[in-house]
């Protein structure tokens, strides 16, 4: 089964971008509380 690179990368970006934003916001709030 051939994997569609465009579909795979698009899905990966859709998953990674919101996760990265949430991690950055979480780290910022945690560092501010300390």
UniProtKB/Swiss-Prot annotation:
It is a single-pass membrane protein. GO terms for biological process: photosynthesis, light reaction. Its main location: plastid. GO terms for cellular component: photosystem II; plastid membrane; thylakoid membrane. InterPro entries: PSII_PsbM, PSII_PsbM_sf. One of the components of the core complex of photosystem II (PSII). PSII is a light-driven water:plastoquinone oxidoreductase that uses light energy to abstract electrons from H(2)O, generating O(2) and a proton gradient subsequently used for ATP formation. It consists of a core antenna complex that captures photons, and an electron transfer chain that converts photonic excitation into a charge separation. This subunit is found at the monomer-monomer interface. The chain crosses the membrane at residues 5-25. NCBIfam families: PS_II_psbM (TIGR03038). It comes from Cuscuta gronovii (Common dodder). PSII is composed of 1 copy each of membrane proteins PsbA, PsbB, PsbC, PsbD, PsbE, PsbF, PsbH, PsbI, PsbJ, PsbK, PsbL, PsbM, PsbT, PsbX, PsbY, PsbZ, Psb30/Ycf12, at least 3 peripheral proteins of the oxygen-evolving complex and a large number of cofactors. It forms dimeric complexes. Keywords: Membrane, Photosynthesis, Photosystem II, Plastid, Reaction center, Transmembrane, Transmembrane helix. This is Photosystem II reaction center protein M. It is found in: Plastid membrane. Belongs to the PsbM family. It holds the Pfam family PsbM.
């Amino acid at each position: 089964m051939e994997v569609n690179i465009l579909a795979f990368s698009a899905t990966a970006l859709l998953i990674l971008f919101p996760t990265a934003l949430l991690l950055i916001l979480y780290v910022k709030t945690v560092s501010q509380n300390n």
